[in-house]
Amino acid sequence: MAVKVLVVDDSGFFRRRVTEILSSDPNIVVVGTATNGKEAIEQALALKPDVITMDYEMPMMDGITAVRHIMQRIPTPVLMFSSLTHEGARVTLDALDAGAVDFLPKNFEDISRNPQKVKQLLCEKINSISRSNRRSSGFGAASAASAAAPAAPTSSSRAPAPTTAPARAVPTRTAAPATAPAAHAHHAPAHPTTSGTPKRKAYKLVAIGTSTGGPVALQRVLTQLPASFPAPLVLIQHMPAAFTKAFAERLDKLCKISVKEAEDGDVLRPGLALLAPGGKQMMVDARGTVKILPGDERLNYKPCVDITFGSAAKSYGDKVLSVVLTGMGADGREGARLLKQAGSTVWAQDEASCVIYGMPMAIVKAELADAIYSLDDIGRHLVEACL
C-alpha cells in the first residue's frame, strides 16, 4: 500500500518540487497540498494522510501551531522542513516538542540542482516514518501528550525531574562475541529475569546514541536525572551542525544536570552531559578528555554513534553503560559490539516507545542488548544503575 503524503508549504516552488520528488517514488502518493497551517489541518482531517511534510513559517497559521492542532485532532507523523540557522534550530526543536517526528533542512539550492540527493533522503524518511507508524499503535497517544506538554522554559533555572511509574524491563539473551576478553566476558543469564531493577555498577561513563525521535527522547530521559548524577554522560544525536548548540542549550535549561555542546579538550565530569557537535565526530580517552574530530565524508553520520561508542570501549573497558534510543538505520550496533566485547552494558529502547525502531532493533537483533526498556523508564533505571 502506497504511503499517502500531504505536502504543506507556502512557497509554490517548494511545494511543487517536493510533490514531484515524492511522486517519483512508486511507494509514495501525494494526496494533497496546503499553503498554510489552517489548510493543513483541514486537509489532514479530510484526506487522513500517513505522513505530512510541513514548513514552519507560513501565513495565517505557522507550522508549529498546526502541528499542535493536528496531534490533538488527528495524530499523524509530521516531517518538518527547517532552515539551517540558530533560529531555525530553535523553531524546529519547538516543533519536535509539539509532536513532529523529524526534520529536514530546507535547502532551495539542493532541491533545484540536486533533486536526486533530496529524493533519496526525503523518500527514505517518509517510508521509514510510515512503516514505523503502521507498526506502532502508540503514536496517537504519545503525540497528543507531546502537543499538550508545555513549551520549553526560557529561564536558566533547573527544572524538576518528572516522575514516572515503574515498568518492567525485558532483558534479552546476549551472546558475548568470541573475541571478547575473557576477563570481561559478559553473558546474559540462561533464564533472564523480568525484574525492572538493573544491576548496579560503578560506571565511569554513560553513553547515549540516537537519531530520528532523539531530541524528544533525550529530553525525556535526561530530565529524570538528578543534579548529583554520579557519572559523566556523552550524547550522540544525528543532527546538523547548526542545531546541536541550540539543542544543548535547551536541554541545559530543562535538566537538573548540566548539558553543553562538546568542544575539543572538554573534560568529563559527573553530572555533565556533553552533546556531540553536528558535522563532526566525538571521541573520549582514558584521561576523561573529549576529542572532537572533523567529519569524515566517508561516514554517513556526523556525529556517528559507532565512533563514540568505540572510543568509550577502548578507554573505559567494562565501565560503560550505553543506551541506544529511537532512530533510523543501525548506527551504534558495531560500537555496541565493541562495548560488549569489553564487558560493558548495552540497553535498547523498546519498539513500542520508539518513533523509529531502527537503531534499537539493530542492537536487539544482534543480541547485544542486556535489557530493553520503555523510554519513560530509561532515566529512572539509569539512576538505579549508577547511584
Swiss-Prot record:
Cell compartment(s), UniProt: Cytoplasm
Post-translational changes noted in the entry: Phosphorylated by CheA. Phosphorylation of the N-terminal regulatory domain activates the methylesterase activity.
Region entry Disordered, spans: 148-199
Catalytic activity from the UniProt record: [protein]-L-glutamate 5-O-methyl ester + H2O = L-glutamyl-[protein] + methanol + H(+); L-glutaminyl-[protein] + H2O = L-glutamyl-[protein] + NH4(+)
Gene Ontology MF terms: phosphorelay response regulator activity; protein-glutamate methylesterase activity; protein-glutamine glutaminase activity
Positions carrying 4-aspartylphosphate: D55
Domain Response regulatory positions: 4-121
Major location category of this protein: cytoplasm
Annotated active site: S211, H238, D331
Coiled coil: none
Origin superkingdom: Bacteria
Record bears the keyword Hydrolase: yes
Sequence ranges assigned to domain CheB-type methylesterase in this UniProt record: 192-384
Keyword field: Chemotaxis, Cytoplasm, Hydrolase, Phosphoprotein
Any Pfam family hit: Response_reg
EC number: 3.1.1.61, 3.5.1.44
The UniProt record lists the keyword Cytoplasm: yes
Function: Involved in chemotaxis. Part of a chemotaxis signal transduction system that modulates chemotaxis in response to various stimuli. Catalyzes the demethylation of specific methylglutamate residues introduced into the chemoreceptors (methyl-accepting chemotaxis proteins or MCP) by CheR. Also mediates the irreversible deamidation of specific glutamine residues to glutamic acid.
Classification via HAMAP family: CheB_chemtxs
Entry remark concerning the domains of this protein: Contains a C-terminal catalytic domain, and an N-terminal region which modulates catalytic activity.
Protein name: Protein-glutamate methylesterase/protein-glutamine glutaminase 2
Organism expressing this protein natively: Pseudomonas savastanoi pv. phaseolicola (strain 1448A / Race 6) (Pseudomonas syringae pv. phaseolicola (strain 1448A / Race 6))
Lineage: Bacteria, Pseudomonadati, Pseudomonadota, Gammaproteobacteria, Pseudomonadales
